[in-house]
C-alpha cells in the first residue's frame, strides 16, 4: 500500500514541500534562513495574538495597557519582549537571507525574488506600524515624521497624509487603524510566503556553486530537516538570551516616556533595522528626493536580476565581485550607524557618501565588474 503522506491530497502537499523535496546536496547554512524566517513569523503571530488580547488601541490607554501587560498579565513581560526582540531577529534573518540571494545569484529565479521583495516591503510596513502601537514618545514622533513624508508627493500629498492620519495630526484614528493593519498584515505575509515557496519549488533551490544540481539531489528529510532544526535551536538560543538578559538593548529609552505631542525628542530615529534607509532619506536635502531615495533603497533589489551581466550565476568563483559585495555590506553597516547619529558634521557628509556608494555599487560597479570578470575567463 502506498504511504498515506503520498496519497492524501493535503499530506501530499506537505510531503512534496518538506519531506520528499529534491534538494541540492551542497547547500550551506546560508540556506537555513528561509526556515528561520518561517519560525520568526510563527513566533511573531502567536506572541502578537496574545498581546492583542490585552492591548487597547486608544491614545488614552495604549501606553498603560502595555505597562499592564508587563506588570499584571502572567508572563506578559516575556510575551512582550519576545515580540519586540522577535522583530529584530526577523530582520536579522531577512537581511542575511537577502544577502545570500545577492551573493549566490538566487535572484535569477525572478518570480521567487520578486515575491521576496514584496515580502520585504510588507514586513517593513508591519514593523513600522507595530512600533507606533506602544504610544511612547518615539512611537508618536516616528509615526508623525514618516507619515509626513507622503506630503512630498506632488498635488495629492497633503490630502493623502490627512487621509492616512484620519485627522489633522497623528491621533486616536491613526493608532486604531495602525493596530488594525498591524494585526492583518502578518497573515497576508504568511500567504505571500506560501506563494514565495510555491515559486521556489517550481524551479528547485539554487546552490553555492550556482551550477545546475539536477544530477545530484537528496531528499529534504532527514538531511535538511535536521540541519534546519539546528538553526532553529540557535535562533531560539539567541532570542531567549536577548529577551532574558537585555530585553531593551535594541529599543529606544524614549519609548518609555508616554507620547507627548507638545514635546519633541532631541533625536527622532526608527528601530535599528530601518536606520540604513533612514540615513539614505536624510542624506538628500530635498524632501521629495529623500522619499524617492528611501523607496528606491529597497526597490533597487527588484532591478538586480536585470543587471546581472556575468556568465556565472554565483559569486563563488568571482573574487572581484566578492570584494564589491563585502564593500556593500560594510556600506550598509556604515549607513545603519549614521542613521542613529545626529544630523551634524561629519555625519552628514559620511551619510551622503555612503548613500551614493550604495546605489553606485548595485547599479554601476557590480555589473561592470561582472563584465570585466567575463573577459578574464578568456585568458
UniProtKB/Swiss-Prot annotation:
Cellular component annotations (GO), alphabetically ordered: mitochondrial inner membrane; respiratory chain complex III
Cofactor(s) needed: heme b
Compartments in which it is found: Mitochondrion inner membrane
GO BP of this protein: mitochondrial electron transport, ubiquinol to cytochrome c
Membrane topology label: Multi-pass membrane protein
Domain of life where this protein originates: Eukaryota
GO MF annotations, alphabetized: metal ion binding; ubiquinol-cytochrome-c reductase activity
Annotated binding of heme b b562, by residue: 83, 182
Residues binding heme b b566, per UniProt: 97, 196
Cofactor remark from the record: Binds 2 heme b groups non-covalently.
Keywords: Electron transport, Heme, Iron, Membrane, Metal-binding, Mitochondrion, Mitochondrion inner membrane, Respiratory chain, Transmembrane, Transmembrane helix, Transport, Ubiquinone
Residue stretches spanning the membrane: 33-53, 77-98, 113-133, 178-198, 226-246, 288-308, 320-340, 347-367
UniProt-annotated binding residues for a ubiquinone: 201
Signal peptide region: none
Pfam families given in the database record: Cytochrom_B_C (PF00032), Cytochrome_B (PF00033)
Family indicated by similarity: Belongs to the cytochrome b family.
Function: Component of the ubiquinol-cytochrome c reductase complex (complex III or cytochrome b-c1 complex) that is part of the mitochondrial respiratory chain. The b-c1 complex mediates electron transfer from ubiquinol to cytochrome c. Contributes to the generation of a proton gradient across the mitochondrial membrane that is then used for ATP synthesis.
Other remarks in the entry: Heme 1 (or BL or b562) is low-potential and absorbs at about 562 nm, and heme 2 (or BH or b566) is high-potential and absorbs at about 566 nm.
Assembly behavior: The cytochrome bc1 complex contains 11 subunits: 3 respiratory subunits (MT-CYB, CYC1 and UQCRFS1), 2 core proteins (UQCRC1 and UQCRC2) and 6 low-molecular weight proteins (UQCRH/QCR6, UQCRB/QCR7, UQCRQ/QCR8, UQCR10/QCR9, UQCR11/QCR10 and a cleavage product of UQCRFS1). This cytochrome bc1 complex then forms a dimer.
This protein's name: Cytochrome b
Lineage: Eukaryota, Metazoa, Chordata, Craniata, Vertebrata
Amino acid at each position: 500500500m502506498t504511504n498515506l503522506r503520498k496519497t492524501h491530497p493535503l499530506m501530499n502537499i506537505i510531503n512534496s514541500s518538506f519531506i520528499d523535496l529534491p534538494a541540492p546536496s551542497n547547500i550551506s547554512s546560508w540556506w537555513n534562513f528561509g526556515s528561520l524566517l518561517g519560525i520568526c513569523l510563527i513566533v511573531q503571530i502567536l506572541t502578537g495574538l496574545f498581546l492583542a488580547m490585552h492591548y487597547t488601541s486608544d491614545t488614552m490607554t495604549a501606553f498603560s495597557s502595555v505597562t499592564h501587560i508587563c506588570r499584571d498579565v502572567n508572563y506578559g513581560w516575556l510575551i512582550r519582549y519576545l515580540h519586540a526582540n522577535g522583530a529584530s531577529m526577523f530582520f536579522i534573518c531577512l537581511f542575511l537571507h537577502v544577502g545570500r540571494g545577492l551573493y549566490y545569484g538566487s535572484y535569477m529565479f525572478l518570480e521567487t525574488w520578486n515575491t521576496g521583495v514584496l515580502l520585504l516591503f510588507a514586513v517593513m510596513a508591519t514593523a513600522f506600524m507595530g512600533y507606533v502601537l506602544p504610544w511612547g514618545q518615539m512611537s508618536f514622533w516616528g509615526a508623525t515624521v514618516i507619515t509626513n513624508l507622503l506630503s512630498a508627493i506632488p498635488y495629492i500629498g497633503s490630502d493623502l497624509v490627512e487621509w492616512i492620519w484620519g485627522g489633522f495630526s497623528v491621533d486616536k484614528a491613526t493608532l486604531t487603524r495602525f493596530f488594525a493593519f498591524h494585526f492583518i498584515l502578518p497573515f497576508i505575509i504568511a500567504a505571500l510566503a506560501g506563494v514565495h515557496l510555491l515559486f521556489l519549488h517550481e524551479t528547485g533551490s539554487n546552490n553555492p556553486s550556482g551550477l545546475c544540481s539536477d544530477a545530484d539531489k537528496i531528499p529534504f528529510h532527514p538531511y535538511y530537516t535536521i540541519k534546519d532544526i539546528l538553526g532553529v535551536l540557535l535562533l531560539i538560543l539567541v532570542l531567549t538570551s536577548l529577551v532574558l538578559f537585555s530585553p531593551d538593548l535594541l529599543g529606544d529609552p524614549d519609548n518609555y516616556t508616554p507620547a507627548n505631542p507638545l514635546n519633541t525628542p532631541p533625536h527622532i530615529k526608527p528601530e535599528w533595522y530601518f536606520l540604513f534607509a533612514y540615513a539614505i532619506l536624510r542624506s538628500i536635502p530635498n524632501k521629495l528626493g529623500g522619499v524617492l531615495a528611501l523607496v528606491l533603497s529597497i526597490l533597487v533589489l527588484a532591478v538586480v536580476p536585470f543587471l546581472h551581466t556575468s556568465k556565472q550565476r554565483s559569486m563563488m568563483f568571482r573574487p572581484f565581485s566578492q570584494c564589491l559585495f563585502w564593500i556593500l555590506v560594510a556600506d550598509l553597516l556604515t549607513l545603519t550607524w549614521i542613521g542613529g547619529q545626529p544630523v551634524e558634521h561629519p555625519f552628514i557628509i559620511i551619510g551622503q557618501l555612503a548613500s551614493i556608494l550604495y546605489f553606485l555599487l548595485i547599479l554601476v560597479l557590480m555589473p561592470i565588474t561582472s563584465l570585466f570578470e567575463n573577459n578574464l575567463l578568456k585568458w
